[in-house]
């Protein structure tokens, strides 16, 4: 199996000293260049920082005025559908509005980076799916000079209630995945539900051991053949959890194109969501996350 190396660590030089409880103001605009191939992260007075980590990690250190959001609070209730984004998208949008998020918000989602499971990418994907256009994500370590452990005294004001404009192309359903498998759509292009005829490509972003059936769901259940290539999700990112140029350029060299329907898959639709957003950032505009993951495909 081919292994695609991780990007070289990119050092981020920032001014200011770090203390246990830094009170850095958001009154100034600050750009964080976190790697080639991705737009710099910009923190300005209008930026909303969303924190995708656990409540404990948030209480320990967070960006001032950031909004904690757990991706698992926005999924279907059935255990086998744990990764599927909730069907009641209006309810999800109302909760976002109460947290201060609107479709026009400039969002930066932060999380545990390569030490986590791509939760910041999953939250960013969810926001984009609901119609929030300007959303990026990175590791919170990239913003360390801004962190504080003080409780929030002035949380963001609620936004007006808004209607979600669903970007359905970001999400692959069980029905679409099974259709592609049954029609051998990874060999010959097909039309799904009357849409344009497209060739399907599957990228499995689980670990190599999980992909080979030595651990995880594939160790106890049969995974149907979808001619998926295996690239563990962390190889799509650099140390700041920004898209890794080398991996994404190699996909193009392997014949992956923006015209193809690329479906990213793992067990639960979390790290696969992060990879989907990285693919979109590099012009693979029909890339989709199978949010249900293998636990939905083979319950």
Where are these regions (language model features)?
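Active-site neighborhoods of enzymes that stabilize oxyanions during catalysis
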Residues: 32-35, 77, 143-226
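N-terminal module-boundary/linker segments of secreted carbohydrate-active enzymes
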Residues: 20-57
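Helix-loop module immediately N-terminal to the HCX5R catalytic loop
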Residues: 76-107, 231-262
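Thiolate-centered catalytic microenvironments shared by cysteine-dependent enzyme domains
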Residues: 24, 86-186, 271-293
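Sec-dependent signal peptide recognition
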Residues: 2-7
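C-terminal soluble interaction/assembly domains
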Residues: 242, 247-250, 259-287, 291-299
